[in-house]
């Protein structure tokens, strides 16, 4: 049997569909698989060159149908795209398809990573495909599209990405897949209208593994014990908040669900994996008990690990949110709903039938189970009242019944559960919306971008009234982009004949008193007054956007665009990777020039502007506010304020919002000029800035704010800040400190969680084997640490940050903290089996010593600072002091270490003291972080 599907492709000729179908069916038979009727029907229709909508339950083999389409496409020289909503699933599919078609033929693009992007088979998120479709349309090199989890079409925030390809890729054939599509009649008609191909819906409600349902009125722990005892584990316990999931994981450690042999197998599977973040020890402890945690707040590497352990059957319980209900291929025998109501971002209500079936469908997987179980817990107050009633009957005493929660709760009972089981998924609703990113992508096309934008709105799956709203918003966004020169007109050279022709047309137009505006070849920008008048008064039959288009189109009667015609272009002077993905990116571009680059805190203000256009990571801001309140409460108690006064003052407090007056005033002015911004709001905050100003590492920040359960939230925020700095801030606005911020953030993000690219490089080895014989380990397992010293600039930025952590300890007279920032002075945690510090090799470190071998102690540092302060007021830590010109790096002759001298900047600007460090490069590579030794602090002379 050939090793991969790629080996089955005929090399001597372009094969026909019959030949390819036969070879694919041979492949299926060779793997001892038997196609379900729906699978067989869908594959046959695909080989008849039809669009297919595959609406079958979870576990019914939709992935194999998609693989058949990829096989057909690659064999016949057509490019196929696989999309889905979850980056982790895109990564998983990428790895699986690399095994079947070879890594040279498969690419990846998720926004976080891009590998072999021009490959004949591309795995990407739906947003990536939508951007390709918007930018290139019918010219895009896309012939086959697989859209997995297509029910995301109805997602409020992201649904437009699933709709755009259906509007703009007439050259492509589509395979739409989901377990919860509902009525597909509309999409059948739209696909055929788009590409002229017949569209077939293949639907089935028959599950390969049947489900049994039960409603439980036992306490949650007892329900789990019962399920485990009955052999119904692994159990996926569904929560709708990350906090509840984490609390349950901790609570369930009191339940013994694993045998000694199973725990030993878990310990072996975890060997070599680096639980190096602050939350790592907790996750490792739960995993040793056979309990996994899965939600979006975790670092990606932990989610991948938990998924792989579950695939091996090593986990008995997974406490998660509904994220596991979307596409991740994890074998679960039982799904247990802790509640049947959910907050959907606007209100709390009973689960939709689609959400219920999507999550419940994870129960029971072919090849693992002969049936699956779906269990719903009664509300907690109902279970408590049943226990009280039993106690009352037993004791003969009356009890006070518990009442349902007043907030974030909608009551449910067994009949609710029964109704959800029987209910079909709701019809998918359009979520089309016009954004800056959409407009820029469409206007970037080689052809007539304005006409393409008109057609996009005209073809979208909205009502006529909604389309008019989209037209107005597109017009407003277009004027904003033009005003800010993000898009601009190119004025061509004109002959005298063309000028006369233009003037005559204008005169004729005015004489007829036409409302439409014909093209003018002399400069005719769109002023602010025209924008306001056009929107306020409304234009006749030709919409506002159509009127804008008429200013850009060539002269009537011309074919294409000639030399004398006015053109529109996206400003090519912006850096190549400039991005407008953030809704308020235009505000950022508008405001950066208002900040004086000569200000000492210019870089910090710019960083705050960047953070202000990003969504609020609420859990981090709440933790910040808690600390602000704690400090204020302590101050007020010292001042003797009474309780009511203290409470009144606490209500006035906010989390840190640096430069908020400047940000709010500039944003209000911006909003006055751009009506569309009313849908958005500015959100000043200080997270990345606080980390940079206080020289904190990722782990420092997590511990300081007790954010262990939200490490993934912090990582995502930092990643977004990094991307905006890199892609949205013009290069001309970046000084050395801003570039160092980029290096600092990029280096931190890579150290915390990385390595998809490393996995791909491993697979490029000609000797790589398929997953059945050699497993691809999760990131962080059985891998040498990344060479942190390879990128010299990023490594230097990380060293400088560590040095300023040390200096900050000196400035605030926290000499123990200063010593702790040195690699030799790192204080290990109390000994424990799962110690992260032991796994990093830091448990047996000796006290730090200077160049002469004398130990550094808190008393010695105190004496050194007293000597310094006899000559200088203090050590400065302001932006000037952090300038890279005050840091001197000298590599050793043997290339095993660096000598780093940091000038101690003082208010008097004498700058006659320095701190000298040795950076051990060998140790740094081993640990994945700079290994610093303090050699001396003292005068230059």
Show the residue positions of the predicted features.
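Conserved C-terminal RecA-like helicase domain
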Residues: 81-83, 91, 98-107, 242-317, ...
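A short beta-strand element within the Helicase C-terminal
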Residues: 317, 324-341, 372-375
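Helicase-associated low-complexity/disordered flanking segments
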Residues: 1-44, 48-52, 260-288
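Non-catalytic terminal extensions of ATP-dependent helicases
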Residues: 292, 312, 404-518, 528, ...
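Conserved P-loop/Walker A NTP-binding site and adjacent catalytic elements of P-loop NTPases
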Residues: 25, 33-208, 216, 234-239, ...
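Conserved interdomain hinge at the start of the Helicase C-terminal
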Residues: 216-240, 247, 304-312
């Amino acid at each position: 049997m050939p090793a991969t599907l790629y080996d089955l492709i005929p090399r001597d000729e372009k094969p026909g569909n019959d030949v390819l179908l036969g070879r694919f069916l041979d492949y299926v038979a060779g793997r001892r698989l038997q196609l379900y009727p729906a699978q067989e029907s869908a594959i046959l229709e695909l080989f008849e060159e039809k669009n297919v909508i595959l609406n079958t339950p979870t576990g019914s083999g939709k992935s194999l149908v998609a693989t058949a389409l990829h096989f057909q496409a690659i064999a016949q020289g057509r490019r196929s795209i696989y999309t889905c909503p979850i980056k982790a699933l895109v990564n998983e599919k990428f790895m699986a398809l690399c095994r079947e078609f070879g890594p040279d033929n498969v690419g990846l693009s998720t926004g976080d990573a891009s590998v072999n992007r021009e490959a004949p088979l591309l795995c990407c998120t739906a947003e990536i495909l939508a951007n390709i479709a918007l930018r290139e349309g019918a010219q895009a090199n896309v012939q086959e599209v697989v859209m997995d989890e297509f029910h995301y079409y109805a997602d409020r925030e992201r649904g437009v990405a699933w709709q755009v390809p259906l509007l703009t890729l007439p050259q492509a054939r589509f395979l739409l897949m989901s377990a919860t599509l509902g009525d597909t009649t509309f999409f059948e008609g739209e696909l055929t209208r788009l590409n002229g191909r017949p569209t077939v819906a293949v639907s089935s409600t028959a599950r390969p593994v049947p489900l049994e349902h039960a409603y439980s009125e036992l306490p949650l722990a007892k329900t789990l014990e019962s399920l485990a005892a009955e052999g119904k584990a692994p159990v996926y316990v569904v929560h709708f908040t990350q906090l509840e999931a984490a609390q349950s994981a901790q609570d369930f450690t009191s339940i013994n669900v694993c045998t000694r042999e199973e725990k030993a197998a878990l310990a072996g599977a975890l060997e070599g994996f680096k639980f190096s973040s602050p939350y790592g020890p907790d996750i490792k402890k739960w995993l040793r008990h056979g309990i996994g945690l899965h939600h979006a707040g975790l670092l990606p590497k932990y989610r991948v690990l938990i998924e792989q352990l579950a695939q091996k059957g090593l986990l008995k319980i997974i406490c998660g949110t509904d994220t596991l209900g979307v596409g991740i291929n994890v074998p679960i025998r039982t799904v247990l709903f802790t509640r049947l109501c959910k907050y959907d971002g606007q209100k709390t209500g009973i689960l939709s039938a689609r959400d219920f079936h999507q999550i419940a469908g994870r129960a029971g997987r072919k090849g693992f189970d002969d049936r699956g179980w779906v269990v719903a817990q009664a509300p907690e107050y109902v279970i408590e009242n049943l226990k009280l009633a039993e106690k009352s009957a037993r004791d003969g005493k009356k009890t006070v019944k518990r009442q349902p929660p007043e907030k974030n709760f909608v009551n449910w009972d067994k009949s609710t559960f029964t109704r959800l089981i029987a209910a079909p998924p709701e019809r998918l609703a359009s979520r089309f919306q016009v954004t800056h990113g959409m407009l820029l992508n469409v206007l970037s096309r080689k052809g007539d971008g304005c006409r393409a934008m008109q057609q996009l709105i005209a073809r979208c799956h909205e009502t006529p009234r909604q389309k008019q709203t989209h037209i107005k918003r597109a017009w407003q966004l277009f004027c904003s982009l033009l005003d800010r020169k993000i898009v601009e007109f190119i004025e061509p050279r004109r002959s005298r004949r063309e000028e006369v022709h233009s003037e005559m047309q204008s005169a004729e137009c005015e004489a007829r008193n036409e409302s439409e505006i014909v093209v003018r070849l002399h400069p005719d920008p769109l002023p602010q007054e025209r924008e306001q008048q056009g929107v306020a008064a409304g234009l006749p039959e030709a919409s506002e956007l159509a009127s804008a288009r008429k200013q850009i189109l060539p002269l009537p009667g011309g074919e294409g665009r000639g030399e004398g015609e006015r053109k529109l272009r996206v400003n090519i002077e912006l850096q190549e990777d400039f991005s407008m993905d953030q809704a308020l990116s235009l505000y950022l571009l508008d405001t950066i020039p208002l900040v004086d680059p000569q200000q000492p805190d210019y870089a910090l203000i710019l960083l705050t502007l960047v953070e202000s256009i990003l969504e609020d990571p609420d859990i981090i801001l709440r933790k910040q506010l808690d600390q602000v309140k704690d400090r204020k409460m302590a101050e007020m108690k010292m001042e003797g304020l009474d309780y009511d006064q203290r409470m009144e003052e606490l209500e006035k407090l906010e989390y840190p919002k640096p430069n908020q007056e400047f940000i709010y005033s500039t944003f209000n002015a911006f909003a006055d000029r751009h009506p569309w911004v009313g849908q958005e709001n500015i959100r000043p905050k200080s997270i990345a800035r606080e980390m940079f100003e206080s020289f904190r590492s990722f782990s420092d920040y997590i511990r300081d704010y007790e954010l262990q359960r939200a490490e993934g939230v912090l990582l995502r925020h930092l990643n977004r800040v990094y991307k905006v700095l890199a892609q949205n801030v013009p290069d001309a606005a970046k000084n050395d400190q801003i570039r160092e911020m980029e290096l600092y953030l990029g280096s931190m993000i890579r150290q915390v969680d990385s390595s998809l690219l490393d996995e791909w490089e491993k697979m490029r080895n000609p000797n790589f084997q398929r997953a059945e014989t050699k497993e691809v380990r999760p990131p962080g397992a059985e891998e040498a640490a990344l060479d942190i010293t390879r990128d010299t600039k990023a490594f230097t930025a990380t060293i400088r940050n560590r040095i300023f952590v040390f200096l900050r300890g000196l400035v605030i007279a926290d000499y123990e903290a200063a010593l702790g920032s040195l690699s030799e002075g790192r204080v290990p945690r109390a000994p424990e089996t799962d110690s992260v510090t032991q796994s990093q090799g830091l448990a047996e470190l000796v006290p730090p010593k200077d160049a002469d071998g004398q130990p550094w102690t808190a008393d010695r540092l105190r004496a050194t600072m007293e000597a310094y302060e006899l000559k200088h007021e203090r050590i400065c830590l302001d932006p000037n002091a952090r300038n890279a010109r005050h840091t001197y790096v000298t590599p050793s002759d043997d290339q095993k270490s660096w000598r780093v001298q940091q000038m101690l900047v003082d208010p008097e600007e004498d700058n006659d003291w320095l701190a000298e460090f040795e950076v051990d490069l060998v140790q740094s590579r081993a640990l994945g972080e700079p290994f610093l030794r303090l050699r001396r602090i003292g005068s230059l002379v």
